[in-house]
Amino acid sequence: MLLLELKKTNQTLGTIHFIGIGGVGMSGIAEILHNLGYKVQGSDLVENYNTKRLESYGIKIFLGQAKQNIKNVSYVVISSAINQNNPEIKEALERKIPIIRRAEMLAELMRLKCSVAVSGSHGKTTTTSLIACLFEAAGLCPTVINGGIINNKSTNAYLGSSNYLIAEADESDATFIHIPSTIAIITNIDPEHLDYYQDFEILIGAFRSFITNLPFYGFAVCCIDHKIVRKLVDDITERKIITYGIDSEDAHIIAFNINTDIASSTFDVKISLPNVLGTTIIEKITIPTPGRHNILNSLAAIAVGIELDFGIKAIKNGFNNFKGVKRRFTKVAEYNKAVIIDDYAHHPEEIKATLATAKNIANQQNGKVIAIFQPHRYSRIKYLFDDFMLCFADADILYITNIYAAGETPIEGITGQSLVDKMTQNKHHDKANFLAELDDVVSIIIDNAASGDMIIMMGAGNISSFANELDRRLLSHEILENTDCDTKSNDKVMQ
């Protein structure tokens, strides 16, 4: 009996408990199960946007994790981020409550669907969202489970009525190779999650399995602008693969005539599919988000749309309806005619892409780029230390904060300060500064921001919460400054 069929019978699963339900991947699966009619609850250490959203749907949320939270549950769902010393896991093991990994639960949801799985080191969330928009524009209503909040829906997951399911496939612990997908997307492959894989070749091998595990009637979509992906594609002959890129003239789908500004990107597309005679040109495709990396993400979506015969009109309409993803180059405030952006970039390649986009926009406005970066995880900084030293070239002024641990134990010699020191010693950046307190960002903006500037707040930790408070903080500072000025003026009058 499959999970999606159980509700057609009298069989019940009882209560399904999610440990860490506030995580973006866990919350999406919990929401879909709830919408399917299953009884869902969960716990997390802190309240956030996802826990509040789920609670508003009637899902019981425990803040804090304790063994009594799973008193009456039948199944426990965990992700790889949950420590085995967690009291709820210990209690589940003690009582022999079945523990299901997040990827296994996702696989069950995908099993009866024609599934599109989007993987890669970067760009998964935006690509998943773009593909979903194209499906809807084509008159299909897919079920979507994403790794970020889709602005069109104000959620990261929603239940559709068609036979399609589109999901972000997390490669962090190799469980993505077990997802039963019909269409597989690989956006890029970079050294990441090496604390799990230990060796980059093992990570590449996992992506190979991701493609070769497809059924014979499925297909993969791969970006061959990325040299590791190109080599992988060249080595696989047993599955159909559609390639895309900007720089790769031999790609099946290529973007050209590219123009970008602060709000959008416009480009033409040349399509030359395998075993199809002739070439198709689609002119003036517009996506309402800037950046070369987002053009690449849209090419992956176009590949799926073309292969499934959506039609050019549906593809263009789908992109026009796209409203972006939370924390992907999201404007959160303005100050002194400078734009403040919140972005999820936390890997060197993501940082380079985000800053390149910001630099392009700043140059058009005669402005500069001010980057404020919060490193995420000691292990990531350790494994990619040299890459982090080199990825901030497009920042005119750079501030690096303390490392956001994300539950990790500190590693000796790996700090935000040590990263800045090494960058300075090796002359990789002459305006790199260590920022001990995020609160000092307000004064940094006040002292440095000018018309046309792009201020980029980056990281996967709590820097986003701070970025989203900047509008209020800067306004409060202005009010305080004006009050001080008025007080001084009144004092002079009284004298």
Swiss-Prot record:
Keywords: ATP-binding, Cell cycle, Cell division, Cell shape, Cell wall biogenesis/degradation, Cytoplasm, Ligase, Nucleotide-binding, Peptidoglycan synthesis. ATP binds at residues 120-126. One of its GO terms (cellular component) is cytoplasm. GO terms for biological process: cell division; cell wall organization; peptidoglycan biosynthetic process; regulation of cell shape. It catalyses: UDP-N-acetyl-alpha-D-muramate + L-alanine + ATP = UDP-N-acetyl-alpha-D-muramoyl-L-alanine + ADP + phosphate + H(+). It is found in: Cytoplasm. Cell wall formation. Belongs to the MurCDEF family. This is UDP-N-acetylmuramate--L-alanine ligase. It comes from Rickettsia prowazekii (strain Madrid E).
